[in-house]
């Protein structure tokens, strides 16, 4: 406890985190893209290469997953306006939201129904391509739908994939790996929902369950993979490949906005609110958004009050050297996808200059907003996916932040507030009814 007091003396906001108060922190270390980019260690070329790789796999995905065929084998989600929800939030919280609120429906992405369909599927495909190219079975000019043939399934069955997950990453990696032909093991933490485990098993995936939290599941997965040279471990805490899979979202969103005639520039700022667990998904997406929109996009991460790992790591500068458990927080939250106690050190250090801020919200707040969104817009999400929904209000109420950036009323009135809905499209009906019953 004495150490916590010392930490609080140095970093006063820790007191609110320990008290499980809903907290908003605006990052005083935020820089321009030009200043912050060198610290990421990845470039626009890296993201373009990821984009090209996904294009090579498009014919394969279109055939392997017919639900992607209409989009030409591209796994992408809709952006929709949510005016009724915006009004409801204003009414419930008595705070005007300037500008327009939109929802990015990664919750309804093909294949696995969450943001993890971006990074998880991309890393599995990257590994499959590498193995097939090295074995001389494939060239980058081939039609990748050839990977569906029995010969390739046979080839890939010699290899295995392992991952640790609270649920959604395991789903995307499990389903994709099984489709390619890999043997796959998903190490699931105690928070993982039973239906996610059942869905994986129905795809022939081995699920190993732990009574402990996310960090333990990842560690065990890493250990199990080390003993097998043919086993590839997908490392949610440190993977650059996962990060790049998420980053592709930036250019894609830019294209969607162009199609909708939506302007993002200095007079029309874009605010994006991303739920954050270990940090790979929101970190990668935020990186891609920064490359696409430069200094006109402002990214915020949202975390449960019981799992504020990235806020704690970035705010104190201790990154993965501190966990929420170190300050007496239990890491128990209904937002199972965000139940992470120790943030990715790679993501924290890469993105600490490119984030405008982080905030926390209570489980009950997520349940309330989950119910309102279902009532007002007919869109059903899992609790984690509502974390971003509290963002627009926090920003519109934060005059100090607005002044620091010199935002005028006109700019705020022209703003777009994009809430990134991270999952929920595959939640079973009975489970969803339970979520809805918990809202006020």
Swiss-Prot record:
GO molecular function, one term: D-serine ammonia-lyase activity
PROSITE patterns: DEHYDRATASE_SER_THR (PS00165)
Cofactors demanded by this protein: pyridoxal 5'-phosphate
InterPro entries noted in UniProt: D_Ser_am_lyase, Ser/Thr_Dehydratase, Ser/Thr_deHydtase_PyrdxlP-BS, TrpB-like_PALP, TrpB-like_PALP_sf
Keywords: Lyase, Pyridoxal phosphate
Residues with N6-(pyridoxal phosphate)lysine modification: 116
Top-rank lineage group of the source organism: Bacteria
EC number of the protein: 4.3.1.18
Catalysed reactions listed for this entry: D-serine = pyruvate + NH4(+)
Biological process, per Gene Ontology: D-serine catabolic process; isoleucine biosynthetic process
Subunit structure: Monomer.
Protein family: Belongs to the serine/threonine dehydratase family. DsdA subfamily.
Protein name in UniProt: D-serine dehydratase
Organism: Salmonella schwarzengrund (strain CVM19633)
């Amino acid at each position: 406890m004495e150490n916590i007091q010392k930490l609080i003396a140095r970093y006063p906001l820790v007191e609110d985190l320990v008290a499980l108060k809903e907290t908003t922190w605006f990052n005083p270390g935020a820089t321009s893209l030009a200043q912050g980019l060198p610290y990421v260690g990845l470039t626009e070329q890296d993201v373009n290469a990821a984009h090209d790789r996904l294009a090579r796999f498009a014919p394969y995905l279109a055939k392997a997953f017919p639900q992607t065929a209409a989009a030409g084998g591209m796994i992408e989600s809709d952006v929709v306006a949510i005016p009724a929800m915006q009004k409801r939030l204003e009414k419930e919280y008595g705070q005007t939201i300037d500008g327009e609120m939109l929802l990015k429906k990664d919750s309804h992405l093909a294949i696995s129904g969450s943001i993890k369909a971006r990074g998880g599927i991309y890393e599995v495909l990257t590994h499959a391509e590498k193995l097939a190219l090295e074995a001389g079975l494939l060239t980058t000019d081939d039609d990748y739908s050839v990977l569906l043939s029995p010969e390739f399934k046979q080839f890939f069955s010699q290899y295995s994939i392992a991952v640790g997950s609270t649920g959604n990453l395991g789903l995307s990696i499990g389903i994709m790996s099984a489709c390619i032909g890999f043997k796959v093991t998903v190490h699931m933490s105690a928070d993982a929902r039973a239906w996610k485990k059942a869905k994986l098993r129905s795809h022939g995936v081995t699920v190993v369950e732990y009574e402990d939290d996310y960090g333990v599941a990842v560690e065990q997965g890493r250990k199990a993979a080390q003993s097998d040279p043919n086993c590839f471990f997908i490392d949610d805490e440190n993977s650059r490949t996962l990060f790049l899979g998420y980053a592709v979202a930036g250019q894609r969103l830019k294209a969607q906005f162009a199609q909708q005639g939506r302007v993002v520039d200095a007079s029309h700022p874009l605010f994006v609110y991303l739920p954050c667990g270990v940090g790979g998904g929101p970190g990668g997406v935020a990186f891609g958004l920064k490359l696409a929109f430069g200094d006109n996009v402002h990214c915020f991460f949202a975390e449960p009050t019981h799992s504020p790992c990235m806020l704690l790591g970035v705010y104190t500068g201790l990154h993965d050297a501190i966990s929420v458990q170190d300050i007496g927080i239990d890491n128990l939250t209904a937002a199972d996808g965000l139940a992470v106690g120790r943030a990715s050190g790679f993501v924290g250090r890469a993105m600490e200059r490119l984030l405008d801020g982080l905030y926390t919200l209570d489980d009950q707040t997520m349940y309330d907003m989950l119910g309102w969104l279902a009532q007002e817009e007919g869109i059903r999400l899992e609790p984690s996916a509502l974390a971003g929904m509290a963002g627009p209000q926090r920003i519109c109420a934060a005059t100090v932040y607005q002044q620091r950036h010199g935002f005028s009323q006109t700019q705020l009135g022209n703003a777009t507030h994009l809430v990134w809905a991270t999952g929920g499209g595959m939640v079973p009906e009975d489970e969803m009814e339970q979520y809805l019953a918990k809202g006020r």
